[in-house]
Amino acid sequence: MSLLTEVETPTRNGWECKCSGSSDPLVIAASIIGILHLILWILDRLFFKFIYRRLKYGLKGGPSTEGVPESMREEYRQEQQNAVDVDDGHFVNIELE
């Protein structure tokens, strides 16, 4: 006899689970683990960037710049700022009267 035939049997109304309401400790533990897994998976998908950045860099805000000359740090900051700045030449100004 397979596990499927022991747990679920077809009825007139559809599929019914015989183990609902069971007080078996294994069923209760499996249910709790399943619910916790679902909650953790949802939280992981919602906050994965923050979580993994925190794990990778710890309490620091990003990669360490220790040992890098100040001129290179300033050059890097300038490159990052230029990448963020918007080029106004790509936009068309439309004035409505």
Swiss-Prot record:
Residue numbers spanned by region Disordered: 61-80
Activity regulation information from UniProt: The M2 protein from most influenza A strains is inhibited by amantadine and rimantadine, resulting in viral uncoating incapacity. Emergence of amantadine-resistant variants is usually rapid.
Principal localisation: virion
Membrane topology type: Single-pass type III membrane protein
Biological processes per GO annotation: protein complex oligomerization; symbiont genome entry into host cell via pore formation in plasma membrane; symbiont-mediated suppression of host autophagy
Record GO cellular component, one term: host cell plasma membrane
Domain of life assignment: Viruses
Keywords associated with the record: Disulfide bond, Host cell membrane, Host membrane, Host-virus interaction, Hydrogen ion transport, Inhibition of host autophagy by virus, Ion channel, Ion transport, Lipoprotein, Membrane, Palmitate, Phosphoprotein, Signal-anchor, Transmembrane, Transmembrane helix, Transport, Viral ion channel, Virion
Site (Seems to be involved in pH gating): residue numbering on this chain: W41
Function: Forms a proton-selective ion channel that is necessary for the efficient release of the viral genome during virus entry. After attaching to the cell surface, the virion enters the cell by endocytosis. Acidification of the endosome triggers M2 ion channel activity.
The record's note on its domains: Cytoplasmic tail plays an important role in virion assembly and morphogenesis.
Note: When the channel is activated, one or more imidazole moieties of His-37 probably become bi-protonated.
Record's subunit section: Homotetramer; composed of two disulfide-linked dimers held together by non-covalent interactions. May interact with matrix protein 1.
Protein name: Matrix protein 2
Lineage: Viruses, Riboviria, Orthornavirae, Negarnaviricota, Polyploviricotina
